[in-house]
Amino acid sequence: MEQTLRWFGPNDPVSLQDIAQTGATGIVTALHHIPNGEVWSIDEIIKRKVEIEHQDGDPKKGASGLTWSVVESIPVHEDIKKQTGNYIQYIENYKESIRNLALCGIKCVCYNFMPVLDWSRTDLSYTVEDGSKALRFDINAFAAFELFILKRPGAENEYSDEQKQKAKSYFEAMTAEDKVKLQQNILAGLPGAEEAYTVEDFLVTLSAYNHIDRQALKNNLFHFLKEIVPVAESKGVLMAIHPDDPPYPILGLPRVVSTEEDLIELMNAAPSKSNGFTMCTGSYGVRADNDLPGIVRRHGDKMNFIHLRSTQRDEEGSFYEANHLEGDVDMYEVVKAILEVEKRNNSKLPMRPDHGHQMLDDLKKKTNPGYSAIGRLRGLAELRGLELGIKRSL
């Protein structure tokens, strides 16, 4: 596997020099400063590419040892997901961004089709047994937010009486500070998210999906794929759709990339090597019914990007992000399956350790949730060792 790390641009507390010291050679990043829906110009792409691939970001200096390997992500505009407003132009802009990236030698694009929120957590500093901090999604906390803070119309019909009682108890035990923090965690956006909302704005945004059910959102995704995949294929670009996180409906919104069946449908909608997926074990792994090694073995030829992460589930559907080799994901079997695919195809797929615990000296620093340096360094080192051990034993 090609070892990569995510970098959020010049304002990321983890610098490119830091990343170079981890042993990673690939950078996963995006042009976060460009508004959703606008074309990524060749000038902007080259500017970022030089910043990554040359020492001190100076084109006159030698290579830095890092390569911009994967784009994560070109955001899909909400109008495209809803097929409203200026969606036709936004699709054309997306195609142009793909063409421009290809001209600059960047040939892998991760993206998602999650409506409104990119990914959701209720606790950004959940303390685990060893004292490090992880990200957590608590189903009762989320229900408390939806029912009693957001007060989304119709939400009460989507929870059982038992769930509503647990949510009420959770809410009543919260302090005013707890409520503000929970709201911020969900609405203020996590790293990589492109939008942040107030409660009022969020309710309006959600209401735009009142008449878009799961099948309608799937149809809109399939239309998008039929438009962009031929362009990507013609330019040698590999698209890699990221699964829903968490992989089940929330906030009354449909989810369309949560299971192996979803993957099969979307890949069949526009058959091409360029219409592939991101194997995110942390997202798919939240569902016990997702066979992660099986998905890799059955669909590895369309696996264009890899996020390796583990979660620890409970019986209610809550989870926290476990250490990379712990939790519910059988990382040994997943990595073994990936290496089998690479051997079969004579390929080297880009992989990043997805998230990491905030630990050691990073506990004293301001970090992007999930993206502190030391936790990801630990994850990358563990995964590198696992890969070496499996390779030597094959």
Curated annotation (Swiss-Prot):
GO process terms (BP): D-glucuronate catabolic process
Q: GO MF annotations for this entry?
A: ferrous iron binding; manganese ion binding; mannonate dehydratase activity
The question of whether Lipid metabolism is a record keyword is answered with: no
Pathway listed for it is: Carbohydrate metabolism; pentose and glucuronate interconversion
Which UniProt key words apply to this protein? Iron, Lyase, Manganese
Q: Which InterPro entries match?
A: Man_deHydtase, Xyl_isomerase-like_sf
Catalytic activities: D-mannonate = 2-dehydro-3-deoxy-D-gluconate + H2O
Enzyme class of the recorded protein, top EC level = lyase
A Pfam match is UxuA
Q: Which cofactor does it need?
A: Fe(2+); Mn(2+)
- Report the EC number(s), separated by commas if there are several: 4.2.1.8
Xref: PANTHER family: MANNONATE DEHYDRATASE (PTHR30387:SF2)
Q: Which family does it belong to?
A: Belongs to the mannonate dehydratase family.
* Function recorded in the entry: Catalyzes the dehydration of D-mannonate.
Q: Kindly provide the name given to this protein in its UniProt entry.
A: Mannonate dehydratase
Q: What is the lineage of its organism?
A: Bacteria, Pseudomonadati, Bacteroidota, Flavobacteriia, Flavobacteriales
